[in-house]
Amino acid sequence: MKIQKPSFEIWLQQPGLDGIYRQIERAGRVCYKSEDHCTADSARPFVERMVKSDHTAMLEHGTVYLACPSAGRPAGAAGPAAALPPAERYRRNKFSWVNDVAGTAYVTTNLRVLAENGWMADLDLLAGP
């Protein structure tokens, strides 16, 4: 038996949607031992395949920051919470954090929350941290 010394690395996520996809791809490729398959344009298709095959665990590694009105119309989501404004949907989600400032709800969540709830359209609300 070979004993491995435990270790970890902190990977800072790059900004924007591309940064989310690249962060998830990096974690997923380590999980699948396929780091050598990363290319400049492989992140998004890799993540889309994970979503399509319902392998959503790795999506938790992609932090998503959204900015939306504290109250208002839904952003085209599907599912049981679709009738709720985006901010309220995330307030009711235990894997999301919402901070209201001057009528704007700043949401911190992860891509798994969006994918599993049919809220991928909310990526139009993407904001910086």
Question: What would you call each of these model-derived segments?
Answer:
Residues M1-P129:
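A conserved ligand/cofactor-binding region detector
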